[in-house]
Amino acid sequence: MNLHEYQAKQLFAEYGLPVPEGFACDTAQEAFEAAGRISTDKKVVKCQVHAGGRGKAGGVEIHDTKDGVKEFAQKWLGKNLVTFQTDAKGQPVTKILVEEASNIANELYLGAVVDRATRRIVFMASTEGGVDIEKIAEETPELIHQAAIDPLVGPQPYQGRELAFKLGLVGDQIKQFVKIFLGLGNMFAQYDLALLEINPLVVTAEGNLLCLDGKINIDSNAMYRQPKLREMHDPSQEDEREAHAAQWELNYVALDGSIGCMVNGAGLAMGTMDIVNLHGGQPANFLDVGGGATKERVTEAFKIILSDTNVKAVLVNIFGGIVRCDLIADGIIGAVEEVGVKVPVVVRLEGNNAPLGSKKLAESGLNIIAATSLTEAAEKVVAAAEGK
């Protein structure tokens, strides 16, 4: 789960980290009033969406007047912002962040991720702030400095000082950086974060550090024990189909192809997508119905797949272990009858009660194409999607 910039800065402030004074606004009038409460002559206004590249897309501007701030809010609230990280539809703008402008002398980068190889939280810092860190890692990796956090003792001041020295910070800036480093390290562990970025972490003209932007991603598997962060969830930023799938405990990711896939098990789902691609098709989605598939969940899975107008055929690939193939067959039949499936459906069942499931499908009288192997299923669904 991702947080908006204003939400990330709220968490930063709770840990005593320096952030610009700002207000998240739902209406243009609120933005106008917020601009009046900010002491600096210039105000920065930012569209709040879960995507980067807002500035280049016109979603970040600097204004000298309250009226300019209000006009910006009127322009964007209720609209979609399209950036290089969104699809063609873009992300809806429901909040505008109005905050004080800062005099920037230097831009740094500070971020943290979970390194699965070392099983540690690893901090990354660089003098190249304000740009894409992946680009820096690829072109000039020597400019990225790291510090691994021992989970038994947590972040240590000496690690913060080492990073500060490598970033060229001096005097009181080192003390400020250590405070930021320790706060972020404790926040990362307490809130079960998966990724944290301050890009840029700026040195102001007065020589102080300031968290000018914030990006936070939370481990979705830990949301059950993070009620505070759950309340920050913004469903408007998610794909509607993915949000619908999550309500039914279905793992769904929308893609750009024309062949809908419904599979049980993430590994088998990825293998199914690969073999569809190998035979010249393009998957329209990743969908794992899981081991506890029921007739109702299978029906909902069909509805979600078919809500994508690009889908020309559907491949159902089930290996019955925990889930029984005859129950999947009941779900397929019920879904086809309820939804009124107009596209070809190719089904491959294997494992627990597969013969009974195949028999039910054959006796249903529905236009369902049976396949006995994964290769055969891929060939048939690709041909069906092409109208052959």
Swiss-Prot record:
<dbReference type="Pfam" id="PF00549">
    <property type="entry name" value="Ligase_CoA"/>
</dbReference>
<dbReference type="GO" id="GO:0000287">
    <property type="term" value="F:magnesium ion binding"/>
</dbReference>
<dbReference type="GO" id="GO:0042709">
    <property type="term" value="C:succinate-CoA ligase complex"/>
</dbReference>
<dbReference type="Pfam" id="PF08442">
    <property type="entry name" value="ATP-grasp_2"/>
</dbReference>
<keyword id="KW-0479">Metal-binding</keyword>
<dbReference type="GO" id="GO:0006099">
    <property type="term" value="P:tricarboxylic acid cycle"/>
</dbReference>
<feature type="binding site">
    <location>
        <position position="99"/>
    </location>
    <ligand>
        <name>ATP</name>
    </ligand>
</feature>
<dbReference type="GO" id="GO:0004775">
    <property type="term" value="F:succinate-CoA ligase (ADP-forming) activity"/>
</dbReference>
<comment type="subunit">
    <text>Heterotetramer of two alpha and two beta subunits.</text>
</comment>
<feature type="binding site">
    <location>
        <position position="107"/>
    </location>
    <ligand>
        <name>ATP</name>
    </ligand>
</feature>
<feature type="binding site">
    <location>
        <position position="102"/>
    </location>
    <ligand>
        <name>ATP</name>
    </ligand>
</feature>
<dbReference type="InterPro" id="IPR005809">
    <property type="entry name" value="Succ_CoA_ligase-like_bsu"/>
</dbReference>
<dbReference type="InterPro" id="IPR017866">
    <property type="entry name" value="Succ-CoA_synthase_bsu_CS"/>
</dbReference>
<feature type="binding site">
    <location>
        <begin position="321"/>
        <end position="323"/>
    </location>
    <ligand>
        <name>substrate</name>
    </ligand>
</feature>
<feature type="binding site">
    <location>
        <position position="213"/>
    </location>
    <ligand>
        <name>Mg(2+)</name>
    </ligand>
</feature>
<dbReference type="GO" id="GO:0006104">
    <property type="term" value="P:succinyl-CoA metabolic process"/>
</dbReference>
<feature type="binding site">
    <location>
        <begin position="53"/>
        <end position="55"/>
    </location>
    <ligand>
        <name>ATP</name>
    </ligand>
</feature>
<keyword id="KW-0816">Tricarboxylic acid cycle</keyword>
<comment type="pathway">
    <text>Carbohydrate metabolism; tricarboxylic acid cycle; succinate from succinyl-CoA (ligase route): step 1/1.</text>
</comment>
<feature type="binding site">
    <location>
        <position position="46"/>
    </location>
    <ligand>
        <name>ATP</name>
    </ligand>
</feature>
<keyword id="KW-0436">Ligase</keyword>
<keyword id="KW-0460">Magnesium</keyword>
<dbReference type="InterPro" id="IPR016102">
    <property type="entry name" value="Succinyl-CoA_synth-like"/>
</dbReference>
<comment type="function">
    <text>Succinyl-CoA synthetase functions in the citric acid cycle (TCA), coupling the hydrolysis of succinyl-CoA to the synthesis of either ATP or GTP and thus represents the only step of substrate-level phosphorylation in the TCA. The beta subunit provides nucleotide specificity of the enzyme and binds the substrate succinate, while the binding sites for coenzyme A and phosphate are found in the alpha subunit.</text>
</comment>
<dbReference type="InterPro" id="IPR013815">
    <property type="entry name" value="ATP_grasp_subdomain_1"/>
</dbReference>
<feature type="binding site">
    <location>
        <position position="264"/>
    </location>
    <ligand>
        <name>substrate</name>
    </ligand>
</feature>
<comment type="similarity">
    <text>Belongs to the succinate/malate CoA ligase beta subunit family.</text>
</comment>
<dbReference type="GO" id="GO:0005524">
    <property type="term" value="F:ATP binding"/>
</dbReference>
<dbReference type="GO" id="GO:0005829">
    <property type="term" value="C:cytosol"/>
</dbReference>
<keyword id="KW-0547">Nucleotide-binding</keyword>
<dbReference type="GO" id="GO:0004776">
    <property type="term" value="F:succinate-CoA ligase (GDP-forming) activity"/>
</dbReference>
<dbReference type="InterPro" id="IPR011761">
    <property type="entry name" value="ATP-grasp"/>
</dbReference>
<keyword id="KW-0067">ATP-binding</keyword>
<feature type="binding site">
    <location>
        <position position="199"/>
    </location>
    <ligand>
        <name>Mg(2+)</name>
    </ligand>
</feature>
<dbReference type="InterPro" id="IPR005811">
    <property type="entry name" value="SUCC_ACL_C"/>
</dbReference>
<dbReference type="InterPro" id="IPR013650">
    <property type="entry name" value="ATP-grasp_succ-CoA_synth-type"/>
</dbReference>
<feature type="domain" description="ATP-grasp">
    <location>
        <begin position="9"/>
        <end position="244"/>
    </location>
</feature>
<protein>
    <recommendedName>
        <fullName>Succinate--CoA ligase [ADP-forming] subunit beta</fullName>
        <ecNumber>6.2.1.5</ecNumber>
    </recommendedName>
</protein>
